[in-house]
Amino acid sequence: MMKVLVVVALLVTLISYSSSEGIDDLEADELLSLMANEQTRKECIPKHHECTSNKHGCCRGNFFKYKCQCTTVVTQDGEQTERCFCGTLPHHKAAELVVGFGKKIFG
């Protein structure tokens, strides 16, 4: 009976050790993922900067992510080109205004 208890204790120890290494691997993967997200955040396009070549690369604002807004520009030669910039959508501006006003009133 004592041998069975020793074998069971040994198996429990081995299983817990192997699962803790698996958890460490998961934590390392999460850390790498967070570092990649931080790098992406540093490389995003700030508000009012051009996003013509990367329309999904705008940074986050206070509450919402900026959206790439495009307009058609006609040159003196008559050529039409598309120019885009990162900005806040009108309904997002309104929501930020209401939240800011609410914070001033309710503290």
Curated annotation (Swiss-Prot):
Family: Belongs to the neurotoxin 19 (CSTX) family. 04 (U1-Lctx) subfamily.
Tissues expressing the protein: Expressed by the venom gland.
Disulfide links within the chain: 44-59, 51-68, 58-86, 70-84
Record note on domains: The presence of a 'disulfide through disulfide knot' structurally defines this protein as a knottin.
Protein name (record): U1-lycotoxin-Ls1j
Cellular compartments annotated: Secreted
Top-level lineage group: Eukaryota
Keywords: Disulfide bond, Knottin, Secreted, Signal, Toxin
Source organism: Lycosa singoriensis (Wolf spider)
One GO CC term on file: extracellular region
GO molecular function: toxin activity
Signal peptide (residue range): 1-20
Propeptide residues per the UniProt entry: 21-41
